[in-house]
Regions:
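Active-site acidic carboxylates
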Residues: 1-91, 154, 160-168, 172
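Secondary-structure boundary/capping motif
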Residues: 23, 101, 127-128, 154-155
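Histidine-anchored nucleotide/phosphate-binding helix
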Residues: 30-38, 129-139
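Active-site-proximal beta-strand/loop segments in catalytic clefts of secreted hydrolases
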Residues: 44-47, 95, 122, 149-150
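Internal catalytic-core helix/loop-beta-alpha segment
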Residues: 69-126
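A short glycine-rich beta-strand->turn/loop micro-motif centered on a GG-aromatic cluster
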Residues: 118-123, 141-156
Length: 174
C-alpha cells in the first residue's frame, strides 16, 4: 500500500518569515523526521502576486507573504533537502486557502480506498483544514489523517478548533 503525504504551505514566510511561529518550526522538525517514509509527497505553496494587499485576503490579513518567486514563497529547505527517497514528488501552487486540484488529482492518482492520505502543515485553522475538507469532499470513502503535531495554527485555540472540525468530518487526527 502506498503512503501519501500532503504538506500544506510549509514555506519560509510561514515558518521563519513574516507569519512564522515557534509552533511552525516544531511542526517542520516533526515533518522532516518522517518525510522520507512516504512514496508520494505533495507540497502546496501559498502563492500571491505583488498586488496581494489589494486582494480580499490582503485586506483581512495585511501582511505580505508568499509573494511568488521570493525567498518567503519557497518551501523550507529542511523539507526540500529531505525528500531524496520519495518516489513521487509534486508541488501545487494555490492562490487561496484550499485548492480544487484535489478533484482532478483524486481522479488521476491511482489511489485505492485502502490507501491513507495524510495531511499536515500550516496553518491548521486556515489552509490545512480547508484542503482536508476539500479532499474529503472529493474522496468521501478515503481514509484521511491529519498529524496534529505536524501542524501549527494561528493560535493554540484555533489549531485545536480546526482539529475538532476535521474529526467531525471523519478525518482522523493522529
Amino acid at each position: 500500500m502506498q503512503k501519501i503525504l500532503i504538506v500544506i504551505d510549509m514555506q519560509n514566510d510561514f515558518v521563519t518569515g513574516s507569519l512564522g511561529s515557534e509552533a511552525a518550526q516544531v511542526a517542520a522538525k516533526n515533518i522532516a523526521a518522517h518525510i522520507n517514509e512516504y512514496d508520494t509527497v505533495i507540497f502546496t505553496r501559498d502563492t500571491h502576486g505583488p498586488d496581494y494587499l489589494d486582494t480580499l485576503e490582503g485586506k483581512f490579513l495585511p501582511v505580505p507573504h508568499c509573494i511568488k518567486d521570493t525567498e518567503g514563497w519557497e518551501i523550507i529547505p529542511e523539507l526540500v533537502n529531505r525528500v531524496s527517497k520519495v518516489k513521487n514528488l509534486y508541488v501545487v501552487d494555490k492562490d487561496t486557502f484550499g485548492t480544487f486540484i484535489w478533484g482532478s488529482m483524486s481522479v488521476n492518482m491511482s489511489v485505492d480506498e485502502d490507501t491513507t492520505i495524510e495531511i499536515c502543515g500550516v496553518c491548521t485553522d486556515i489552509c490545512v483544514v480547508s484542503n482536508a475538507l476539500i479532499m474529503r469532499a472529493f474522496r468521501p470513502n478515503q481514509k484521511i489523517e491529519c498529524h496534529k503535531d505536524w501542524c501549527a495554527g494561528t493560535s493554540i485555540a484555533a489549531h485545536e478548533a480546526a482539529l475538532k472540525v476535521m474529526e467531525s468530518c471523519q478525518i482522523e487526527v493522529i
